[in-house]
């Protein structure tokens, strides 16, 4: 990967994936119930309802796969690196608190953070998820692209 922005994005959104997939379940249930109760209206023809449910189910599968991919990549990298990434991106701990908890000097922490992000990016690539693949795989998830754009903006400000 050219930069680690997808790695940062995937790690950051991980904490929301389970809740969103549960929300998708509720949407599927609501679609099914609405089609049952309002089957006489034109808006709820069987094909339209089926396509909507299939679309939601595919979205749920994609998000579950993203969650599993994230967890597998974290297992594949060094334990300390995984703890750094989980603390920073998933638990959103302040860097100084995380460095202290891990018994690292701040300078060492930031050096290790960069190494951890790079290791995670390489793990994503080993699973076949380059920048281009990640962009196409998550094409319909605008909220994830918003997070990605925020990391891109931060990178441009630092340059």
Show which residues each predicted segment covers:
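N-terminal interaction/assembly modules
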Residues: 1-73, 121-159
């Amino acid at each position: 990967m050219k930069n680690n922005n997808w790695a940062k994005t995937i790690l950051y959104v991980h904490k929301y994936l389970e809740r969103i997939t549960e929300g998708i379940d509720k949407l599927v249930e609501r679609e099914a119930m609405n089609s049952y109760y309002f089957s006489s209206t034109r808006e709820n023809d069987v094909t339209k309802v089926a396509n909507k449910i299939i679309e939601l189910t595919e979205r749920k599968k994609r998000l579950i796969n993203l969650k599993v991919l994230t967890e597998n990549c974290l297992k594949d990298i060094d334990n300390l690196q995984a703890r750094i990434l989980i603390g920073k991106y998933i638990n959103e701990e302040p860097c100084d608190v995380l460095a202290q908890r891990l018994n690292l000097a701040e300078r060492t922490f930031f050096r290790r953070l960069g190494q951890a992000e790079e290791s995670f990016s390489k793990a994503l690539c080993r699973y076949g998820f380059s920048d281009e693949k990640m962009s196409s795989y998550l094409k319909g998830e605008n909220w994830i692209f918003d997070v990605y754009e925020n990391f891109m903006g931060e990178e441009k400000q630092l340059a």
